[in-house]
Amino acid sequence: MDEMVLLTQEWLNETYKGKSGYNSIEENGKTGWKTMYALTRALQLELGITQTSDSFGPTTLRKLKELGPISTSTNSKKNIVKIIQGALYCKGYGPGGLTGTFGQGTKEAIAEMQLHMGLSKTDGVVTPKVFKALLNMDSYILLNGASEKVRSIQQWLNNKYYNRENFYFMPCDGLYSRDTQKSLVYAIQYEEGLSDSIANGNFGPTTQRLIPVLRIGETDEKNSFIHLFQAALIFNGYNVPFDGVYSESVRSKVKAFQSFAKLQQSGTADFQTWASLLVSTGDPNRKGVACDSITQITSDRAESLKRAGYKIVGRYLTNAPGSTLNKKIQPGELETILKSGLNVFPIYQTYGGATNYFNKEQGKKDAFAAYKAAKEYGFKNNTVIYFAVDYDAYGNDLNNNIIPHFEGINEIMNGFLGSTYKIGIYAPRNVCTIVSKKGLAFASFVSGMSTGFSGNLGYPLPYNWAFDQISTITVGNGSGMIEIDNDICSGLDNGVNTINIVPSENKKFFDQIDVLYETAEKYAQMQSDLNNGVKKTQLANELVAQYLRKDDYKGWKWVPTAGQIDPIYREWAVKR
């Protein structure tokens, strides 16, 4: 517990409790989002905003601009200064008390935070953007286990671009995150010459069109594109200098990344390389050799996929209970897929689209269900089954739901069932990485199309990625037309090209039917020869049915509906 954080919480509740737009908070001396939200709402009330919000939005920013910079030389409301001082304590800085007076202690605390944010101008003045940076949980000091190099880039970006209208201070904690990635895209847009009204932090068509190609020997002179490209490499885990020089060492790391992401290994910073560094789809127009689909693969569709260059197809083991969507592998479909020369990999998903689905017990159930279905379809041992996390899981969801779920899957699949099948995960990048690093998944199938997911934005490709789902397309035409998800394949898992022939539970019965029909067909041929044109096939079918009902469905009562039983054929069949 921090005494000054507690004092801040007590002051907030004492001052604003009962006022419309303020929500009282627990007084526990612990910094957290609820305290930051309370400080934000208190500021909004002091600025005359009646429709308060937890969000530090455009109205709050506009009102602060109207108020002007806050410093030792300005006369601000006492309560606004207390909000600044309380926020400083929550951030770990000491302003010298919750006094309501913007004195030297407050100025020095703000200046220290500005230094940590990377600003060359550490004047201790609270501008609207500095105030916004105060009222969140971002850290401006290096966190345990984080990268000093990443932090230095975060600071560099803050200092270089904070004067642009929509560029807000990012954390300087040494962690590559959603905010850092978005700030990097803003910086690219500014270097491309986009105005403040157009730059939006999204890697959209205009940004893509203007992205430059960078080559060995080039340096940053008139712009900072090489710095930004180096930053993208560093954020993705490639240790290159951050010096604005496209050196041989940079080229070498670029080729390593291109190899990992299955791009052409040119060593050049081309569009596809930029895209793969910045967004989870990379270039969505890339053509993969793998795909997945909810639609049955017929022979015509298989031919369409092959003509389009696909070699591997993912299909679902089961349908979702209560759903009318029939997405599972159909009888005979695997034989059709494999006969066409395609490989196949299995996906298990019944629902998996929200947090409350995931827990350890459900993981155990899913393991049993996936195992049963895979065995019934004939998938051989060591086939990878991909279990789906089909939503933007982050924060507490991971520790409280997703990890226990995959622990349950492992307990059954690798314990009780004896490691028959390998466990894969279908999920956003970060979820795949966290689950895999805990040893709970062998391979990752990345839901890369969801570029805005928290688990994709600001996270590199998982080290064990097998498939990367980047676009939905339609291939073929007529009876061969099929909609698929287009997947890039790393080669870690190429699916399977053979399955076990699964014996039917009714094999003995079907064998008996085969013998009966063969006998009936011979008898029917004789009848056809004797009776000029009796339809042999129809008669053979009727004779088989007669034999099967001979013991229980006989006698004069059955004659009007089922007809007479041919006694000669019956004796013939019994002998055989």
Swiss-Prot record:
InterPro entries: Glycoside_hydrolase_SF, Peptidoglycan-bd-like, PGBD-like_sf, PGBDSf, Rv2525c-like_Glyco_Hydro-like. Belongs to the FadG family. This is Uncharacterized protein FadG. The gene is fadG. Induction: Repressed by FadR in the absence of LCFAs (fatty acids of 14-20 carbon atoms). When LCFAs are present in the medium, they are converted to long-chain acyl-CoAs, which antagonize FadR as to its binding to fadR boxes on target DNA and thus derepress transcription. The lineage of its organism: Bacteria, Bacillati, Bacillota, Bacilli, Bacillales. It holds the Pfam family Rv2525c_GlyHyd-like. It comes from the Bacteria. Coiled coil: none annotated.
